[in-house]
Swiss-Prot record:
GO terms for molecular function: ATP binding; tRNA dimethylallyltransferase activity. The lineage of its organism: Bacteria, Bacillati, Chloroflexota, Chloroflexia, Chloroflexales. Substrate binds at T11, A12, V13, G14, K15, T16. Gene3D superfamilies: 1.10.20.140, P-loop containing nucleotide triphosphate hydrolases (3.40.50.300). GO terms for biological process: tRNA modification. The record marks T100, R123 as: Interaction with substrate tRNA. This is tRNA dimethylallyltransferase. Residues 34-37 are annotated as: Interaction with substrate tRNA. Its cofactor is Mg(2+). It comes from Chloroflexus aggregans (strain MD-66 / DSM 9485). It is an enzyme of class 2 (transferase). Keywords: ATP-binding, Magnesium, Nucleotide-binding, Transferase, tRNA processing. SUPFAM superfamilies: P-loop containing nucleoside triphosphate hydrolases (SSF52540). Pfam families: IPPT.
């Protein structure tokens, strides 16, 4: 069975540094598993690998969509599996690298993802239900037709509740049944990079300061000037939506930066919950001899 190395971990843990150094040593190529780095024109806020880093090792699934374009989990899975197969066919080693839990699980666990395209009118109708009757009402609808999915998805995650209802209403099949898994066509070695949470928070805060110094606020302004609306999934993502009050004149920049810190810390906690459920994890801390040797 073909080899795959997966490097997972929360934001700011050091995935990119390790992945690039390791890829150089083993003739590897990096397949990004980051739901924000797929977007062009969004470089600073997504902590996208720099041009220098991308030149040191081939990268895949970065800068493949414009900010207004949709990108589903099924599309990611298809493109990631194709990239992995292509890399292996050329005798190179694929490294799946990222912190988006669903992206990682879809590839590593062999998720069977419903190929139901987005239904804008249906989504708008369901969004109105959530808005006027509350997320709990929408979640109750899901529980009535797919209790397994409802048990997995919290009522507060309106986007996933809507997707589950959309799949059922279009296909007539519960999304939980359509998401049954089969073994992937490779043998993954999954490495979870782990640091103490206080250290992660400090590293994330320092990176936010670097982002601000590098022009993150200007990047957001340029996206808005280009016609990209806050309602887009890309613009509502971490690193961008936190600046909406600043650009709408309802908060100062310092307040928005503090909100970005707070939301990033919360995101780190959610990421760690995802990684714990991945199978066959090797946990590496910064003093792990292999981690130290690779980046030396």
């Amino acid at each position: 069975m073909n080899e795959l190395i997966a490097i997972v971990g929360p934001t700011a843990v050091g995935k990119t540094e390790l992945a690039v150094a390791w890829a150089q040593r083993i003739n590897g190529e990096i397949v990004s598993a980051d739901s924000r780095q797929i977007y062009r024109k969004m470089n600073i806020g997504t902590a996208k690998p720099s041009a220098t880093e991308q030149a040191l090792a081939p990268h895949h699934l970065i800068d493949i969509r414009d900010p207004e374009q949709s990108f589903s989990l099924a599309e990611f899975q298809d493109l990631a599996l194709a990239a992995i197969a292509d890399i292996q066919a050329r005798g190179h080693v694929p490294l799946l690298v990222g912190g988006t839990g669903q992206y990682l699980a879809a590839v590593l666990e062999g998720w069977q993802i419903p190929r139901v395209p987005p239904q804008p009118e249906l989504r708008a109708e369901l969004e109105q239900v959530a808005l006027h009757e509350g997320p709990a009402t929408l979640h109750a609808r899901l529980a009535a037709v797919d209790p397994v999915a409802a048990a997995r998805i919290p009522p507060t995650n309106v986007r996933r509740v809507i997707r589950a209802l959309e799949v059922y209403l279009v296909s007539g099949e519960p999304i939980s049944r359509l998401q049954e898994r089969q073994p992937p066509p490779f043998r993954p070695r999954t490495i979870w990079l782990h640091r103490p949470r206080t250290e992660l928070y400090a590293r994330a805060d320092a990176r936010i300061e670097r982002m601000i110094a590098a022009g993150l606020v200007d990047e957001v302004a340029e996206l808005l000037a280009g016609g990209y609306d806050w309602s887009l999934p890309a613009m509502s993502s971490l690193g961008y939506i936190q600046f909406r009050p600043y650009f709408e004149g309802t908060a100062d920049l310092t307040t928005c930066i503090e909100r970005l810190r707070f939301d990033t810390h919360a995101f780190i906690r959610r990421q760690e919950m995802w990684f714990r459920r991945l199978p066959n994890l090797e946990i590496w801390t910064p003093d792990h001899p292999d981690w130290r040797a690779i980046i030396a």
